[in-house]
Amino acid sequence: MAALRLLAWALPRGVSALRPPPALPHRLIRRYVSDRSGSVHFYTDPVKAVEGVKDGSTVMLGGFGLCGIPENLIGALKTKGVKDLKIVSSNVGVDDFGLGILLASKQVRRVVCSYLGENALCEKLYLAGELELEMTPQGTLAERIRAGGTGVPAFYTPTGYGTLVQEGGSPIRYAPDGHLITLSEPREVREFQGRFYLLEHAIRADFALIKGWKADRSGNVIFRGSARNFNVPMCKAADISVVEVEEIVDVGTFAPEDIHVPNIYVDRVIKGPKFEKRIERLTTRDSKPAPGSKDNDPSRTRIIKRAALEFQDGMYANLGIGIPVLASNYISPKMTVYLHSENGILGLGPFPLKNEVDADVINAGKQTVTVVPGGCFFASDDSFAMIRGGHLQLTMLGAMQVSQYGDLANWMVPGKKVKGMGGAMDLVSSKKTRVVVTMEHCTKTKQPKILKKCTMPLTGKRCVDLIITEKAVFEVNHSKGLTLVELWEGSSVDDIKATTACSFAVSPNLKPMQQIKLDA
């Protein structure tokens, strides 16, 4: 009200507030800035910046992998020694950096995340009963956080229907002897326009620890590259948001339209004393695969070259790590395909040269990447709005198992292997997006991966549209089952029957397995 009175006083009589006002006196500008910055506190000591975090607090940690993590504030939590923390994070980084530091010091009671990645310590603590782990689809996690920041208590999403997320029973806590103590609860389900949706509840935290690029002296924040990720929605969803930045600049340095998080969401700012900005998976296009690596496997190359035929000019596509990403190397230069990465990039380019590597520009597989001209960055909640909203024409990903009706399992082996679903459940949840699975036909122990019914926890139910292996290509009808449409020249229909654990039809137009031509 005081600001409105000042504005009314400054406007000449008869001048509408709807019209562009004359410039305000400089003393008023100073008054406005000093009034607002008084509610944003600036710190030089990271430990003091996290004052108020106590045993049992719920803390959101921004970032994706190691990109955009608040490394100085995480270090401050370790120094502070608080314990029994409930951490909300997109994933858990690595053993000795990021969230891994707090796990190693046994300060965390529960982690709410979507993906463990390569953090063997987290997986070990979880399976040993020393850590509670609440796995949530990445897009659902982003939306739960966004809802928490906007005052929306709950929402419905198609993600996770027909999986453990909906049914409940996903292991949250094991006992030291290996038996289950805590399981996830089933979700409420409602039908809208012939589709089933799960009720998900918003998440809020006591504290959000955020990594920005720059902040001005009134607390407005901007981010760099793909480091926007979960930082933006988390900054809005906590009682106290603490932002560490690389630089603090004067008010007015940022154009108003360039500000990513307005100061109304920011409580504390600190310029980080130092930044390691470690890269989890340094990948360059001028590095050659090691001898004996999978990249030199002829069977793998065969799948890649067949998968590349699924791209169409003008398509928006999301590619999983491994074979799907490698298939993009074969996109024709005559064709434009907009590659989406769920951590917040549209317009992925090739891997960088060594002198182009940027820790703030990574893909969903934590690899260093480039962005093509016309590409853009955005936050994780926007990214999954694109996914769930059906704005992608294609998603291509790997699998542990696929059923004859298109059920997909690719995120968990109970009691043995826990990686998490990441964004996969969201990617296969849109009916408008074609789902292509690329995988080897059998496991390393020669067990079929195409089954009558998946035995592992599902990622999605009746969602796969096409299966590509080194032996064959199957089209999937969600009510009728599989049809063999392409066969590698070294295989036979009898061979496919012997290595596929379900029935399938054979197309009357069965043809040799197609391969993209390098000059196509």
Curated annotation (Swiss-Prot):
What does the function comment of this entry state? Key enzyme for ketone body catabolism. Transfers the CoA moiety from succinate to acetoacetate. Formation of the enzyme-CoA intermediate proceeds via an unstable anhydride species formed between the carboxylate groups of the enzyme and substrate. Probably play and important roles in the energy metabolism of spermatozoa.
Which of UniProt's keywords are assigned here?
Mitochondrion, Transferase, Transit peptide
Q: Which family does it belong to?
A: Belongs to the 3-oxoacid CoA-transferase family.
Which segment is the transit peptide?
A: 1-39
Tell me which species this is from: Mus musculus
Q: How does it assemble?
A: Homodimer.
| A single BP term in Gene Ontology | ketone body catabolic process
This chain belongs to which protein, by name?
Answer: Succinyl-CoA:3-ketoacid coenzyme A transferase 2A, mitochondrial
Residues of the region (Disordered) are 280-299
What domain of life does the native source organism fall in? Eukaryota
InterPro entries (alphabetical): 3-oxoacid_CoA-transf_A, 3-oxoacid_CoA-transf_B, 3-oxoacid_CoA-transferase, CoA_trans_fam_I, CoA_transf_AS, CoA_transf_BS, NagB/RpiA_transferase-like
Q: Which PANTHER family would you find in this protein's record?
A: KETOACID-COENZYME A TRANSFERASE, SUCCINYL-COA:3-KETOACID COENZYME A TRANSFERASE 2, MITOCHONDRIAL
EC number of the protein: 2.8.3.5
Q: Which PROSITE patterns match?
A: COA_TRANSF_1, COA_TRANSF_2
Give the record's GO CC terms.
mitochondrion
Record's Pfam families? CoA_trans (PF01144)
In its keyword annotation, does this UniProt entry include Secreted? Answer: no
Recorded hits in Gene3D superfamilies, A to Z, give: Glutaconate Coenzyme A-transferase
**For this protein, what reaction is catalysed?**
a 3-oxo acid + succinyl-CoA = a 3-oxoacyl-CoA + succinate
Pathway recorded for this protein: Ketone metabolism; succinyl-CoA degradation; acetoacetyl-CoA from succinyl-CoA: step 1/1
Location in or out of the cell: Mitochondrion
The active site lies at 342 (5-glutamyl coenzyme a thioester intermediate)
Q: Which molecular function term from Gene Ontology is one that the record holds? A: succinyl-CoA:3-oxo-acid CoA-transferase activity
Q: Which NCBIfam families match?
A: pcaI_scoA_fam, pcaJ_scoB_fam
